[in-house]
Amino acid sequence: MRNLPCLGTAGGSGLGGIAGKPSPTMEAVEASTASHRHSTSSYFATTYYHLTDDECHSGVNQLGGVFVGGRPLPDSTRQKIVELAHSGARPCDISRILQVSNGCVSKILGRYYETGSIRPRAIGGSKPRVATAEVVSKISQYKRECPSIFAWEIRDRLLQENVCTNDNIPSVSSINRVLRNLAAQKEQQSTGSGSSSTSAGNSISAKVSVSIGGNVSNVASGSRGTLSSSTDLMQTATPLNSSESGGASNSGEGSEQEAIYEKLRLLNTQHAAGPGPLEPARAAPLVGQSPNHLGTRSSHPQLVHGNHQALQQHQQQSWPPRHYSGSWYPTSLSEIPISSAPNIASVTAYASGPSLAHSLSPPNDIESLASIGHQRNCPVATEDIHLKKELDGHQSDETGSGEGENSNGGASNIGNTEDDQARLILKRKLQRNRTSFTNDQIDSLEKEFERTHYPDVFARERLAGKIGLPEARIQVWFSNRRAKWRREEKLRNQRRTPNSTGASATSSSTSATASLTDSPNSLSACSSLLSGSAGGPSVSTINGLSSPSTLSTNVNAPTLGAGIDSSESPTPIPHIRPSCTSDNDNGRQSEDCRRVCSPCPLGVGGHQNTHHIQSNGHAQGHALVPAISPRLNFNSGSFGAMYSNMHHTALSMSDSYGAVTPIPSFNHSAVGPLAPPSPIPQQGDLTPSSLYPCHMTLRPPPMAPAHHHIVPGDGGRPAGVGLGSGQSANLGASCSGSGYEVLSAYALPPPPMASSSAADSSFSAASSASANVTPHHTIAQESCPSPCSSASHFGVAHSSGFSSDPISPAVSSYAHMSYNYASSANTMTPSSASGTSAHVAPGKQQFFASCFYSPWV
């Protein structure tokens, strides 16, 4: 309830043009008929005169209205809000006229439509009430019996006498507040003995109970002492004269209200078609006025409340007649004049029937007045009061306790069924039902949204005529649809940028740990291609990538026993072993499991001889890269599976391609590095790259061991294997029904099945003339800069570069290399000694071109 604006009319006079005088003794506010504009201080003194100077912390809202932080809106302003709504003003107009925030207007009107009450909800009203009437009476009894009793003693006594339980016992602060309220009531009883008033010669007994925090509740005279007076006037708060105005005269109120309604007419371009300017004499008169005067002066010294009624109107004053006499108000609301008392001017009823009463006082006053024989002046029956109390959820057990300081008054806006029906009609009139769209409408809207996110008014009108919706609803739909699209786009961007932190292996050696971010802007260039189809194997030969030299696949095992020289001869078939045990053949620890460079595509060696893989027990540091999730964004697929827990090694690349970058790869097999035109740098030259990679997604295998290592086919001693041939290398792999795709870029073999044979779960290497491929899925190898240097890649002992021969002139960039590779892969026809025919994927070249010639996703 913070920053709720109080009544702030646009520079008009205060309530009745009062020049308020707040004082510590809360003396009566002197009425003034001056029509001069009030200042802010006097306005505050009028509206919030029950607050002390320390409590009146004012502010100005964006509309220019003033408010007191933490205090509810005054009842007079609430009443004006409801009146303007009944007159047909929109909430935004009401907000501008009264200079009250739009949210406050909407909340007050919504509560009024639902419950018929304009009262604010209790502060902390969601909490259960504990200071009930029974508890308050007990506290009062204990205090009378022992005036020096403490609050905690009262609390203990309430528990001992089973008045309360531990669940609903009031706190010490609540008990102290009740005691303060009781003391204020006692003081009020002693000082306000002559302040009660009557009307039409009928003496009315009433007692005003005043709380310290501004809570005033009217207690029936039958319960406590009688304060009677047959001569004083009884003040009441009509819809335009609430208790905040005190005993103010209404002589200046007509001009103020006329100014408000003139604003409303100007906003709605409707000028008053009914009566002319309203005289101040037609303002809602105070009940109990003598026939010869309208401006009355209150002699009550304790009009101390800003939210509730200070005194109860005995004759139920109806809505002021002048507000329903013009063209503003719906014709369904009839105007039936009723006469209340001999000396009271006739007023018009707000709705059909004489039983409407818009009193804002608590219902127990009306009940008590009815119980002492004044029903003739009160058109509301007691059963109607009880019914309305049930409807409003009013709890009258807070009498004098201060707990119900802002509770809804059950008797407020008590009316008959016609009033309820009129309010429901207003609710249906002012509140629009939520729009339900049909499937055809949604389809049309979505098609238009695909065309443009911001259709102009002509497009919206055309669409409105097509699908039968108002243009305003279409505009709102597009606004909501754009918000939904922005949310989805944000999620898509988050998916494109995964967590770059992975479980990096904890190594005891001097291994440098590098971190990669698998984003399109920060990965190394890794040209990748799917060359195999599900139907049969395909064998590709890289003709344009290297000079007549061997393509070697260096396969690193957990421990490399001896160098294997594979020159012009078939190589052993390496099995994939899904374990990372420490085979201490040459004193090498299980750390070698982490040193396995995985098959970022097959390295092309421009070396005329073969490569030697030697494991002589050297311990050279390898850059370990934490696990990341490589992705491949295919044209038609959206692969989201990731390998997020695999350890990747960093491979060093030649500086001839601009930068030496770590490349994400899986520890399934190791592939030799690409031969650049210049000598390969050493391992220390690892720098980040800005080249774009192909993002590849992998469906996780059914069994995901920590590392896969390749060992010789017979399962004997571990050894590295090199695949090589004089002209080309034909490398294939079979999934043997393992159930996941094999991607060419990573040369990723499937995990072995339990009963698979060596031929089913191995790489099959061929010489230059044949391609021995086990038919199911194939792995096509491709060039990729392999950043492992010659001195540190798998512990290669020789120090010379792999090749100084330049790549063929036709290959000027990665795109050309890839294109030549795709062309050669599509056009070659390998000679198959085993009789298996090569099958090339038809969309391979298209995919490859989309990777390198289309914008990266």
Swiss-Prot record:
A single GO BP annotation from the record?
regulation of insulin-like growth factor receptor signaling pathway
| Ranges of compositional bias, category Polar residues | 289-301
Report the locations given in the UniProt record.
Nucleus
Q: Quick one: where's region RED subdomain?
A: 134-182
Q: Does the keyword Transferase apply?
A: no
Any one GO cellular component localisation term in the record? nucleus
Locate the compositionally biased regions of type Low complexity.
Answer: 241-257, 308-317, 404-416, 500-519
Its keywords, alphabetically, are: Developmental protein, DNA-binding, Homeobox, Nucleus, Paired box, Transcription, Transcription regulation
Name the chain's protein. Paired box protein Pax-6
Source organism of this protein record: Drosophila melanogaster (Fruit fly)
Q: Which gene encodes it?
A: ey
